[in-house]
Curated annotation (Swiss-Prot):
One of its GO terms (biological process) is peptide biosynthetic process. CDD domains: S1_EF-P_repeat_1, S1_EF-P_repeat_2. One of its GO terms (cellular component) is cytoplasm. The lineage of its organism: Bacteria, Bacillati, Bacillota, Bacilli, Bacillales. The gene is efp. The keyword Isomerase does not apply. This is Elongation factor P. SMART domains: EFP, Elong-fact-P_C.
Length: 185
């Protein structure tokens, strides 16, 4: 058990028969009445985000999530195959489970698979990935308004906004948290 006063971003808790990750939290001390903790939680099974308020000092269960280092091998229909790099054991995850992560996954990429009591919850990507641009419009000289961007498609099929100087064939570093351009790779 852990007190809600000890919440940290990224902490995994058990509440209402679900496994949740703390995305945001805020301690609130109103002038009148008891203090409370307002939090934003992501359900690790469904991906749903919920706002929940706890009384200060309330206890919740701490969920022990195991992260297994695995390598993404290939897609087989709507199943995606990952291999444990130590035991060579393979697991399959459905496209629905890793829909967001597929935008950044390429073959042979190392990721962490999140497991809770033997149940596979999902894939944890690195903070950034390096992907190659497969399609974008050429940047037009003189078209340099402050912060101008254009659409670019990378090798996984994901489309994002990039600065005008990015060309086809360039490698980009992309933030996997929000899918935004970081820099050229």
């Amino acid at each position: 058990m852990i007190s809600v006063n000890d919440f940290k971003t990224g902490l995994t808790i058990e509440v209402d028969n679900g496994i949740w990750r703390v995305i945001e939290f805020q301690h609130v001390k109103p002038g009148k009445g008891a203090a409370f903790v307002r939090s934003k939680l992501r359900n690790l099974r469904t991906g749903a985000i919920q706002e929940k308020t706890f009384r200060a000092g309330e206890k919740v269960g701490k969920a022990q999530i195991d992260n297994k280092r695995m390598q993404y091998l290939y897609a087989s229909g709507d199943q995606h195959v990952f291999m444990d790099t130590e035991s060579y054991e393979q697991i399959e995850l459905s496209e629905d489970t890793i829909e967001y992560e597929l935008k950044f996954l390429k073959e042979n990429m190392e990721v962490h698979i999140q497991m809770y009591e033997g149940e596979t919850l999902g894939v944890e990507l690195p903070n950034t990935v390096t992907l190659q641009v497969t399609e974008t419009e050429p940047g037009i000289k003189g078209d340099t308004a402050q912060g101008a961007t254009k659409a670019a498609t990378v090798e996984t099929g994901y489309t994002l906004n990039v600065p005008l100087f990015v060309n086809e064939g360039d490698t980009l570093i992309i933030n996997t948290t929000d899918g935004s351009y970081v820099s050229r790779g």
